[in-house]
């Protein structure tokens, strides 16, 4: 795979100087056009052999284009904060906004290669990391990202010659880093595993470009031209019409039973039983979150449900059991301008708690397959694709020790109507009812179908949905608390078996 990058590609100075002005002008123009469109973020992944010109090339790119629109990120040793989160959390936080370019050193490929080369894990774990990288990049590209992956290459002979030349030069020996010497000892393994990674992850939506790094002129022009070609192709790509205009009618089957129809909404608790069970479950939750085993876990609770189903009341009863320093409540509304400039999961990744912490999502990433689907705020392909993306997201969370509990609070139409009318009559509850609530009520069958599809496609063994019979608020609140406690205790029990 690397043979063509070891044959001595070179460009003389005259040819380089003649080609450079037009290339710089075209790159800057394409960069500005993409920034003005603000439809795509550009992600440039820098990998390869030490000393092959990675840093020098990125420095040139910052000179050729507007550096104010470029963010260079280096992912070296993980910080304590990063170690307390799922592995890809650090990359999601640093994604550039649409219209901007992010250049990533030490990215996910660097981490997986270093881990395998130095024996931190075996081939099976490397293959898992490769599959995870493919899924991440596919999702980013589906959300509009433009990904360039560069492998800067030197042959083993060229690398050793470079090190010897620099070592013997008193003025430039400082340019040799400890990583240079380290890689000179592991070159064969690094290239062997690098070839495996490139072969598995070079896709039409995010291909690898292998750059011979010996000649600076050739290296610089080649990278610049590849960037220009990709950026111009993105600018010339014909986008489909707005999803709000093209989405077809939803396939609603009003006469078919769904999981929601199987719920016994008459379930209830007496006031006396409620007080007893509520206090017991709150005490249980408080103890579970203080348990030393929580140091290996984080907790995420997702609350979805019909309007007026009592999500807020259930959340307050959960929070009442805890020290405010232990948890955060994240209400999810329509995305802000900054959030629209990112892939839709970005705003949720940023809120994932560190180990030992608890985050409550009042509405969540499931908006993509609920309100966005029903109201036509995204395309049909977007929400259909989202089921797999959400399952992958939640799998990454659980693999990192996050306990994910998901609640759908269900009420019937008559109960919702009564609660709406009550909110309109009581002054201190009036803020809870809006025109949108009444409008959404008219789409009850549409939402019922969307909820059924959501549960069918995203209730998994690792992150199952819990359907809460919420006509009786007391029953719902206790069931929510009990479910959270059971999920935590199951996670603690699994820890013992490891």
From Swiss-Prot:
Pfam families: PPK2. It comes from the Bacteria. Residues 11-234 are annotated as: PPK2 1. The keyword Repeat applies. Its EC number is 2.7.4.33. It is an enzyme of class 2 (transferase). The keyword Transit peptide does not apply. It catalyses: [phosphate](n) + ADP = [phosphate](n+1) + AMP. InterPro entries: P-loop_NTPase, PolyP_AMP_Tfrase, PPK2-related. Keywords: Kinase, Repeat, Transferase. GO terms for biological process: polyphosphate metabolic process. GO terms for molecular function: kinase activity; polyphosphate:AMP phosphotransferase activity. Residues 269-491 are annotated as: PPK2 2. NCBIfam families: poly_P_AMP_trns. Uses inorganic polyphosphate (polyP) as a donor to convert AMP to ADP. Can also convert GMP to GDP, with lower efficiency. Belongs to the polyphosphate kinase 2 (PPK2) family. Class II subfamily. This is Polyphosphate:AMP phosphotransferase.
